Amino acid sequence: MTELSAFAPLTPAEEKLLTTCAGPERVTLGEGALPGEEAGEDVTVRAALLRELLLGLYEHPLNPKGLRLRGARITGTLDLQGTDCSQDITLSACRIEGEMNLVNASLRGLHLQGCWVKAITADNARFSGSVYLRGESHVAGEIGLAGARIGGDLQLCGVTIDGGGQDAVFAPSLRVEGSAFLGNYPYAEGETTLTCRGMLFFSSARIDHDCFITNCAVDLPDEPLGHEAFGATEEHGSDIAVSLARARVGGILYFQHNEIGRVVNLAGAEVARFKDEPSGQGASYPLRLDGFRYSDFSRHADTRPTERLSWLARRPEELNFNAQPYEQLAHVLGRMGHRSDAQTVLMVKERLLRAENRRLRAETSGYGPRWLMMWLSDMVLRFTVGYGYRPGRSVAFAVVLIAGLAAFYQATWNAGDMTPNAAPILTSQPWIAATESHPEGPGAFWSQPGQAGQDWETFSSLAYAADLVIPLVNFGQEDAWAPSTSRSPLGRLGWGLRWLAKGIGWIVTALAAAALTGVIRRD
């Protein structure tokens, strides 16, 4: 403890502080407004004197409420490194010209309202209470909270932070036993903001309750830290604006109404509930979602698959495709009862995953036969059964195929190229006579009432097409009629088309059965 005589002569502001600090009222210097850089001794207090007061200058004990000071110009570094301070530090409209050094300190609470601060370094500090920076405060340097422990809430609301080439907030492994509010405090009247020049780095942080990141504007300096040690979108890379990588949030992560031009990193984070804006003007920033886990969406969150798929697609360009974010979204949507939406997400995931596999194949082996087979099989699975998630597509595909074939074989019939599929009939006198008298349509003439084939199976182009496509059902058309290869090109084309239609029919039927029975693995 330093003797009071060491601070002689005291400034008028220091004398007022010493004589009134034990009282229940806040000590106000001057008019209580934020002092300028050239403020006089009537509001000037040395940080070293404040340190002694906080640590127990016995002749002038503080009120149990702690240090409560307004309108002071505090000179020098407030150095509490490694100390045990049982007092709250509450400063309002104060200019703190030196750094606040709270490294490894134990304090009750830190509350800054409308202050100007050079920088705050509180790595591994212990706060039994809360940490508040509010009321249009300005921090000219970095706020360091690496490894700090906060027993209450963390509020950075109504604050401007200029990291001075460093991070705006550097808080890896921060532990908050309450909630964290960055930007707007939702439980008060009016709205507040957080404006930063520098990264908000909360990697591996743990927040026991809720985390609100709203009304935040984050810009990065021209030469951000970490641009050489990490890739642009890695850990502390040059393109990371907000990092909650591997963070744990016990309540809701509320991420909305922000202006962020670079990457938001949620890789490996885990939250109980999630609320954000998947689309819109404020949702243009890239997202790292690989490994991001959330148990549920807020009831007011937009869970439409179109919006959520756009959200997932906002990964940084240099980041390779990862299936986990799609599987996580589908899992949560399924638990919410949105099964069709979950299947839509998984179907898109499968399409993108297969496209990524084809890209890797092309990079290693070029666009050869193997790549072509991969592409062909992917297209068949995609459009026939939706990779197993939409087996009903096979029915629609079959209907379209049957309709197309029906139109073709009706044209073939009209051209006279459909003949009875029986050798004895083709050599019979009535059929030969029909081909001679009506060469433009012998089948239609031969099978009409009053002719030799009136009791033969009546031709139906629709049933004939269904007979070809559906392998498990026999409509009798293919047994009765067949295209002729000795007449017009339609007959020759129709004869070969039968085999293609049968092959496609078998493939579609097999895929539909596999999708319905789960043979096509979907998980």
Specify the residue positions occupied by each region the protein language model found.
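C-terminal substrate/ligand-recognition segments
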Residues: 397-401, 405, 499-523
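Long, positively charged binding patches that form subdomain-scale interaction surfaces
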Residues: 380-408
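Pore-loop/selectivity-filter region of tetrameric P-loop cation channels
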Residues: 373-391, 415-504, 511
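Hydrophobic, well-ordered secondary-structure elements that form the walls
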Residues: 342, 408, 516
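N-terminal leader/targeting and pre-domain segments
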Residues: 1-377
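A sequence/structure-level signal for intrinsically flexible, low-complexity segments enriched in small
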Residues: 361-368, 394, 406, 410
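Membrane-interfacial segments
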Residues: 412, 416-420, 517-521
